[in-house]
Amino acid sequence: MGRRRSHERRDLPPNLYIRNNGYYCYRDPRTGKEFGLGRDRRIAITEAIQANIELFSGHKHKPLTARINSDNSVTLHSWLDRYEKILASRGIKQKTLINYMSKIKAIRRGLPDAPLEDITTKEIAAMLSGYIDEGKAASAKLIRSTLSDAFREAIAEGHITTNPVAATRAAKSEVRRSRLTADEYLKIYQAAESSPCWLRLAMELAVVTGQRVGDLCEMKWSDIVDGYLYVEQSKTGVKIAIPTTLHVDALGISMKETLDKCKEILGGETIIASTRREPLSSGTVSRYFMRARKASGLSFEGDPPTFHELRSLSARLYEKQISDKFAQHLLGHKSDTMASQYRDDRGREWDKIEIK
């Protein structure tokens, strides 16, 4: 029969001990390491009981106080409902809003509907790692950005004080699409001789204006006022006014001459039009460019360049010819960081573009 515990020790929970000087210690049964708890018996017993529950429950146990407090907390999924309304109030384009919604849907699938303050960096990192492991680093990067923005809005409304996304690593997505050089442009342009006449004109206009294919297809003659082509970019909503006196010296392209040819040869309501003088879709333009690229006989490392690469080529040529700031304005980018993604060689006011 074991030695009877003293009166002071008789009612203590397992792993809690009292020293002769009345000081309480908790001994971790896994390691034998002791932790001091002070001389307050009631507090020491409460701490020891909670520690025993945490160590031996076999699952993540949430303290009663945390459960009580969480009744007044906003959960992640309910906050995402609120975040969707915040996005809608920003006045962003429908296409951009749809892209946000797809990321929010992925977040709902990947994270529990727990109180915002209980969502951990570890849980977020695990979700993002799942995408990276599947070779979807670009998706992981976009989801992380959306989730971080959602938590920033929650902080702004006072629901939480820290952003658990901030400590996660941003996924590095490798862009595999090849850049297009000026010489390669000329070879594809030459190969496009057998294509419909509008393809060459679309290529010229893409390089001299630096705009996306979707915006090129939407350009109308009525958008030209007092020597400026007014473009509201469909992707970002950025409004820019491009001087029709622009020219790309490296390729011998004059915007005025290209516009004159479009009016004389195509003669549609839109600047780029089909042989029937009807508007063209971005898919049609991109598809015919792909055919001309294949006909050129050029080979590329990585994914071959699409029509979109003419925008990057434009930025790089204007950077050399005029300045990087000019290229940034022309592309409609808000930050130097984003503009540099297009300028590198890969190895609700109108912004009036001025040639300086």
Curated annotation (Swiss-Prot):
Residue ranges occupied by any Core-binding (CB) domain in the UniProt entry: 74-155
Catalytic residues of the enzyme: 212, 235, 308, 311, 333, 342 (o-(3'-phospho-dna)-tyrosine intermediate)
Family: Belongs to the 'phage' integrase family.
UniProt keyword annotations, A-Z: DNA integration, DNA recombination, DNA-binding, Hydrolase, Transferase, Viral genome integration, Virus entry into host cell
GO MF term list: DNA binding; hydrolase activity; integrase activity; transferase activity
Organism classification: Viruses, Duplodnaviria, Heunggongvirae, Uroviricota, Caudoviricetes
Region forming the signal peptide: none
The protein's name in its UniProt record: Integrase
Note: Bacteriophage 434 is a lysogenic phage that shares extensive DNA homology with bacteriophage lambda. It inserts its DNA into the E.coli chromosome at or near the lambda insertion site. Complementation of integration functions between the two phages has been demonstrated.
EC code: 2.7.7.-, 3.1.-.-
CDD domains for the chain: INT_Lambda_C
GO biological process, one term: viral genome integration into host DNA
Tyr recombinase domain sequence ranges: 175-355
TM regions (residue ranges): none
Biological role: Integrase is necessary for integration of the phage into the host genome by site-specific recombination. In conjunction with excisionase, integrase is also necessary for excision of the prophage from the host genome.
InterPro entries: CB, DNA-bd_dom_sf, DNA_brk_join_enz, Integrase-like_cat_sf, Integrase_catalytic, Integrase_lambda-typ_DNA-bd_N, Integrase_recombinase_N, Phage_int_M
